[in-house]
């Protein structure tokens, strides 16, 4: 869906955006009809039901490797660091015991989002993660939930900016600065005490809670554009407008085959990948820009967007669910991607459909929240893996890492590694 004329006018007159002017790329229904859940080159290997668990005391899900603004995953003084969304497991809490007094881990897992906290882990090996604890003390974050974002190592002094999402009440992109301290024994993240809210959905480009009570606005991922050197950020949003008011027009349809013109209730799915630009490299002041990619009539969620810059191309990845697809479309939980030669597009859906790495049909919920790193490694967490009959095992732990090859507009699954294998691409020695 293209931007309204008033929105473009505001953009042209904006102090930070300068002469930026572009139309969002449309991920069309015709593109999404090409999604093939049975293509082995875009299917994640099966996860065994006997997987190991990182912790018996906490669930983990969205995983955020410490990195620099160009995407390089870094270690510090030889220690790799990841942040994860974390929630305590409650095996002895009466509210999570069933009628027979047994722990209902499935219900505990389903309730985790309401108590999500940002925690950190460290390792000498890029796996075998040691739990470090909370990043922010209780009460530092101004909302009840701490949702995903990106930790950025700023310099060799150990300063870190954690961009994340403040949720409930509302949803805001926020930043908190702290530092990393290392020793021979381990790692400590310290002084994450002053949270600054950067921006919220504006209602012009991005849907607000007032426009749709089930709106999506989260998952900041800052980066420096390798071409212009400016600091930008992608994030998940929904296209602005009252719920149900969007039109699935010719652009959103794309060249669909006969029999696919009727889209039913697809107007309710209005996901997009948002963009903002910073005033300078400090990242203290930001201005919202129009979406880079819209999925009106295709999908309602484009979570955790992030870039890989390779071979002069911009690879823009996001994750999405089967259940958030619009009526008449389907696709696996997993990674979707778009590729272009410029930050502002236009973009092309990778592998023609957008699908890069999906769960296998026989285990549709085995993994989620993938993060594609510049070395081609892809990390994710285990959600649930089928066991006997209709039963399944809850994960809440790191999944096996896989490697994908990016070749032009195409991608290929190549290798599988150990659970939670997230090696640094570069070691930073603190001064």
Curated annotation (Swiss-Prot):
Chain residues that bind sucrose: 61-62, 148, 218-219
Q: What reaction does this enzyme carry out catalytically? A: [6)-beta-D-fructofuranosyl-(2->](n) alpha-D-glucopyranoside + sucrose = [6)-beta-D-fructofuranosyl-(2->](n+1) alpha-D-glucopyranoside + D-glucose
Q: Which domain of life is it from?
A: Bacteria
Knocked-out gene: effects:
Disruption mutant does not exhibit a levan-deficient phenotype. The lscB-lscC double mutant is completely defective in levan formation and can be complemented by either lscB or lscC.
The record's InterPro entries line, in alphabetical order, gives:
Glyco_hydro_68, Glyco_hydro_beta-prop_sf
Q: What is its induction behaviour? A: The upstream region of the gene contains a phage-associated promoter element (PAPE), which also includes the first 48 nucleotides of lscB and is essential for expression of the gene. Even though the upstream region of the gene is sufficient to promote expression, the expression level is enhanced by the presence of the 48-bp N-terminus of lscB. Expression is induced by the transcriptional regulator LscR, which is able to bind specifically to lsc upstream PAPE sequence. Transcription is temperature-dependent.
**Primary role:** Catalyzes the synthesis of levan, a fructose polymer, by transferring the fructosyl moiety from sucrose to a growing acceptor molecule.
Q: What else is known?
A: Strain PG4180 contains three levansucrase-encoding genes: lscA, lscB and lscC. Of the three copies, only lscB and lscC have been shown to be expressed while no expression was observed for lscA under the tested growth conditions.
Its protein name is Levansucrase LscB
Please report the organism this UniProt entry assigns to the protein.
Pseudomonas savastanoi pv. glycinea (Pseudomonas syringae pv. glycinea)
């Amino acid at each position: 869906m293209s931007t309204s004329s008033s929105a473009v006018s505001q953009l042209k007159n904006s102090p930070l955006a300068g002469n930026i002017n572009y139309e969002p790329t449309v991920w069309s229904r015709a593109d999404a009809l090409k999604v093939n859940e049975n293509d082995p080159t875009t299917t994640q290997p099966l996860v065994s039901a006997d997987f190991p668990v990182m912790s018996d005391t906490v669930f983990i899900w969205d995983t955020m490797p410490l990195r620099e603004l160009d995407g390089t995953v870094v270690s510090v003084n030889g220690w790799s660091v990841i942040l994860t969304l974390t929630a305590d497991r409650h095996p002895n809490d009466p509210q999570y015991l069933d009628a027979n007094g047994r722990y209902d881990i499935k219900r505990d897992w389903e309730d985790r989002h309401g108590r999500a906290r940002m925690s950190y882990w460290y390792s000498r090996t890029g796996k075998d993660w040691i739990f470090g604890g909370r990043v922010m003390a209780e009460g530092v974050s101004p909302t009840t939930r701490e949702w995903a974002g990106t930790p950025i190592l700023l310099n060799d002094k150990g300063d870190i900016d954690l961009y994340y999402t403040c949720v409930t009440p509302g949803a805001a992109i926020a930043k908190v600065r702290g530092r990393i301290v290392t020793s021979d024994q381990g790692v400590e993240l310290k002084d994450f005490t002053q949270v600054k809210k950067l921006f919220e959905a504006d209602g012009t480009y991005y849907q607000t809670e007032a426009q749709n009570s089930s709106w999506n606005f989260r998952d900041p991922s800052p980066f420096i554009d390798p071409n212009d050197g400016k600091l930008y950020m992608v994030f998940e949003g929904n296209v602005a407008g009252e719920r149900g008011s969007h039109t699935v027009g010719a652009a959103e349809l794309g060249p669909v085959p006969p029999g696919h013109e009727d889209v039913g209730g697809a107007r309710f799915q209005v996901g997009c990948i948002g963009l903002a630009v910073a005033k300078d490299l400090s990242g203290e002041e930001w201005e919202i820009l129009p979406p880079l990619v819209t999925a009106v009539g295709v999908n309602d969620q484009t979570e955790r967007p992030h870039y890989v810059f390779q071979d002069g191309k911009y690879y823009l990845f996001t994750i999405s669910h089967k259940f958030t697809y619009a009526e008449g479309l389907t696709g696996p939980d997993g990674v979707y991607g778009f590729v272009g030669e410029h930050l502002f597009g236009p973009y092309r859906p990778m592998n023609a459909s957008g699908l890069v790495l999906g769960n296998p049909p026989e285990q549709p919920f085995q993994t989620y929240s993938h993060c594609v790193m510049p070395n081609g490694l892809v990390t994710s967490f285990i959600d649930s893996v089928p066991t006997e009959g209709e039963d399944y095992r809850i994960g809440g732990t790191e999944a096996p890492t896989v490697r994908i090859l990016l070749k032009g507009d195409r991608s290929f699954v190549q290798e599988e590694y150990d659970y939670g294998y997230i090696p640094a691409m570069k070691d930073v020695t603190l001064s």
